[in-house]
């Protein structure tokens, strides 16, 4: 427990503010995301095709806007002011969904606001990285603990979202999300620092100009995209699979997701502690190997107890990838924390787009069980690519 004491000694008001903002913004996001399809179906009256189109347009718009803002944030301006602007957009987006039920308005104005709002989280992590670097603090552990706040938010957020939406209505739920974003904005404005741009030494000039030109960055992006494709295919398909083919209760899906999210927290923190000893590549290879075991296990072990037990491998997979994966991008792109963090989050968005298409096609043609064979194969490819990225 020495590392916990060390972290406690190094914690100060600014660090605590980073943690609280990450948690609050995570809860606000976790209130909206799990219930979006239900909202579009019941409140807006959208058919399945239009619901899927909404997700696709939202993801594509998010990638474009976040890359544009990331490039600007790394080269000019105050990153903290950009986060405040994104929070304002998040408030507007939540209020739009609270009081509007027109599909065309939501897929245009709503998607635009959401794509701007979703940039807040990668920019928050980029600001945290720059602050930790400038204050000579432990970057990896701090980032891991901060990322764990998002997992904690996702333990709390989805059950709370369904409780609010089903008992009090979507207007109340989205209004509460807007209120949480407002509190986050106040904390960001008064507690988080503005970090001055650091002039990079000349030997890092190529890294500043490059990024995507680096084959290691490209390979890590593809590997990360495949990892999140696997995770999203599982999240989309699992609730349908356990009820329609395994004959297990619907509520088990919630328990499985909650168990995995809870176990991710210690996995993230332990990964942050051990990464200096073993290196980022080895930790990521261990994580993706755990993912391969998880998805392969789903093919052969389908009982309720087996599914719960397998969540340990799922937690190791997502917990390490979500924390160390982002830091690996940042270390491969020195001086471009915003672009690197956004590239990581865009690998998640790209994975979501691919997962929706692949899962839908496979499940429609060959059934839910075939989905997990495809996921297992994709995870093996991700493991191979991860092992080929250089360690930094």
From Swiss-Prot:
Disulfide bridge positions per record: none
Organism of origin: Escherichia coli (strain K12)
Record-linked InterPro entries: MFS, MFS_dom, MFS_trans_sf, Sugar_efflux
Single GO molecular function: carbohydrate:proton symporter activity
PROSITE patterns: MFS
UniProt KW keywords: Cell inner membrane, Cell membrane, Membrane, Sugar transport, Transmembrane, Transmembrane helix, Transport
Cytoplasmic side: 1-10, 70-81, 128-149, 193-219, 273-282, 330-342, 387-392
Translocase in keyword set: no
Reported function: Involved in the efflux of sugars. The physiological role may be the detoxification of non-metabolizable sugar analogs. Can transport IPTG, lactose and glucose. Has broad substrate specificity, with preferences for glucosides or galactosides with alkyl or aryl substituents.
Topology feature Periplasmic, residues: 32-48, 103-106, 171, 241-251, 304-308, 364-365
Gene Ontology cellular-component terms listed: membrane; plasma membrane
Family statement: Belongs to the major facilitator superfamily. Set transporter family.
SUPFAM superfamilies associated with the record: MFS general substrate transporter
Keyword Transmembrane: yes
UniProt-listed GO biological process terms: carbohydrate transmembrane transport; cellular response to glucose-phosphate stress; D-glucose transmembrane transport; lactose transport
Highest taxon of the lineage: Bacteria
PANTHER family associated with the record: SUGAR EFFLUX TRANSPORTER A-RELATED
Membrane topology: Multi-pass membrane protein
Name of the protein this chain belongs to: Sugar efflux transporter A
Cell compartments where the protein resides: Cell inner membrane
Transmembrane segments: 11-31, 49-69, 82-102, 107-127, 150-170, 172-192, 220-240, 252-272, 283-303, 309-329, 343-363, 366-386
